[in-house]
């Protein structure tokens, strides 16, 4: 077996350069996020935008729920991939970043596909229990990840996808010296999903790591 390559920043940039191009508004969101200092870390990687776009196209996904929206890069990437009659519901509790995200959605003419709900996602998930989704993307507060994952089964279609970001947690999941609550929480989630007979799953090393689960 050949040696697996380590994804450095140079390799990540190379991947982005040779993948399909982002839209002007996606680039504008990235430029805006670059002005935010440490908060920029909440942005998904460009390679993850490409992955979300392609998985939606390949799987003929129509209805998506996003848990954690920030300034809208992942949501816009999802919306651009959806068919004209597709729908994305984006959950986030931050009113200020939601306003910014909505402004970008309008600029990209995708606002008709996207409904934003501004409140804690735990509450929103209970209120959405009568809806069904083809895909759920989880990228919010890490300490609630397991609850978001479990609640997703109430509203995901059979054969649907649950995709979870940050599951490699800057590589700290494999560092035995890291025992902070966030690292422990991500480790526990990964172990939980690995034993979950309701799904088949893989961790993909894009960005900070994504778990892709197909619901059986």
Model region roles, listed by residue range:
Residues 1-135, 142-163, 167-216:
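A short alpha-helical cap/connector motif
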């Amino acid at each position: 077996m050949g040696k697996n390559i380590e994804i450095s920043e140079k390799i990540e940039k190379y991947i982005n350069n040779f993948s399909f191009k982002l839209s002007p508004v996606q680039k504008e969101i990235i430029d805006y996020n670059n002005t935010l200092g440490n908060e920029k870390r909440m942005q998904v990687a460009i390679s993850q935008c490409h992955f979300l776009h392609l998985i939606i196209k390949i799987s003929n996904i129509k209805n998506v729920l996003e848990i954690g929206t920030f300034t809208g890069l992942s949501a816009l990437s999802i919306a651009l991939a959806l068919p004209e009659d597709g729908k994305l519901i984006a959950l986030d509790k931050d009113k200020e970043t939601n306003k910014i995200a909505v402004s970008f959605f309008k600029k990209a003419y995708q606002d008709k596909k996207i409904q934003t709900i501004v409140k804690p996602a735990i509450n929103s998930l209970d209120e959405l229990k009568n809806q069904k989704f083809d895909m759920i993307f989880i990228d919010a507060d890490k300490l609630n990840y397991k609850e978001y994952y479990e609640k997703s089964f109430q509203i995901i279609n059979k054969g649907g996808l649950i995709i979870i970001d940050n599951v490699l947690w800057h590589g700290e999941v494999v560092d035995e010296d890291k025992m902070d609550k966030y690292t422990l929480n991500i480790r526990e989630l990964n172990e939980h999903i690995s034993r979950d007979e309701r799904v088949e799953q893989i961790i993909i090393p894009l960005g900070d790591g994504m778990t892709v689960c197909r619901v059986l």
